[in-house]
């Protein structure tokens, strides 16, 4: 699957805090496996999505494919996604890597308006 080169693990994948993005984390960035999602909304619909993860190919697969499906959806529709949906969206992962489905689901569950520091 071809994905924009800028998607992969670059700092620009995180929007500025001033963008009014929603942010959710599955796992703790810098402390092992994690997936972080930032959504920018326009009229209740996802206009832009940025993701970061720990860099494992399985984490990249899940975040890339989730990003493709989340863009253009409402927050209500996104919050209805369950683990089975994410597994279907992301495709099969190698043995022992299924926890990335759960990390993505947790990041979605934890989506909150990002606070300015």
Language-model regions, residue ranges each:
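Domain-level signature for proteins that mediate thiol-based redox and metal-cofactor handling
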Residues: 1-117
